[in-house]
Amino acid sequence: MRLPVLVVSVLAAALSLGACDQAGTSSTAMDGSLAAADGGIVSAAPRTVDPGSAHDNLNAVLWVQTSAEYRALSLQSFRAAADHLARALEEPNWDALVPSERANAGTGLQPAVIMDIDETVLDNSPYQARLVRSGEHYDEVSWAGWVAEKKAAALPGVVDFARAASIKGVTIIYISNRAQHLDEATIANLKAVGMPVKDADVFLGLGTHVEGCEQHGSEKNCRRQRIGRDYRVLMQFGDQLGDFVQVLSNTAEGRAALLEEYGDWFGERWWMLPNPTYGSWEPAAFNNDWGLPPEARRQAKRAALDVAP
């Protein structure tokens, strides 16, 4: 299947770094939750190491914070999405929800765009940078403290896109794996960077109850279904595959199959932002077993590398 050039460039840029998540944490740590192998939510314990030793996330965080390439990819994504917005509004059957997540017809509903927050709207790389410098790793206490600071900046291009969509009558919906109790600080941060926030109901954090749908772990499918009851979803933005569709099998093969099935949606209805610092792509390399020692996980990731023998 031919993928849009934009998609290929974003995926290539993110994956080529080869930088993994903070050792000893989950791939979804920055969303405020940890996905266990069985799909449940577990807590991360802080782990202190020698600050002078190599940190798994150093190159990835440095790239996000300093490279022109990262900024260019972000600008490119949001500008390209803006170019598709008029067409999405004009076509009454345009829908960015997969069929299994829409129980009702979207035609005639008010338009909306669904956005993940962390590393899609807000840049949390300063929090990551602190962990790299200190030699520590994600934990819920330090993460909640960072959220409370409300210092996350907006990704390049996102505010311009969101404001343009809002002017056209499109509601911006935020589906995030930040815990629901972090809503006030999160909404304040969104408003501070200039993002449109219609009301408190547009933030659907982890733990949001959706009647008639049982949420598994940190999956977002139930919350997407809830939005689909009231809105015609024109586009979705995220930095993880699970921001767009439910990932039932978090293996390299399972993830590749989803991309094969929905590849044509990227660059049109779905817009992926680069995030080399963490993601569910990492535990897919070691069978989602966060109980393995850090070095065992690194060995599994090395074994997954393609060296073109």
What is the role of each PLM region?
Residues 110-112, 121-156, 160-163, 167:
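Active-site neighborhood of HAD-like aspartate-dependent phosphohydrolases
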Residues 119, 158-190, 202-205, 239-241:
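Substrate-recognition element of Asp-dependent hydrolases with the DxDx(T/V) motif
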Residues 29-32, 183-309:
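C-terminal cap/substrate-recognition subdomain and adjoining C-terminal extension
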Residues 62-74, 144-151, 173-178, 210-214:
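Second-shell loop/turn segments in exported
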Residues 20-115, 287-309:
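Non-catalytic pre-domain segments flanking phosphatase-related domains
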Residues 7-18:
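Bacterial N-terminal signal peptides
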Residues 76, 80, 145, 153, ...:
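Extracytoplasmic/secreted proteins, especially bacterial periplasmic and envelope-associated proteins
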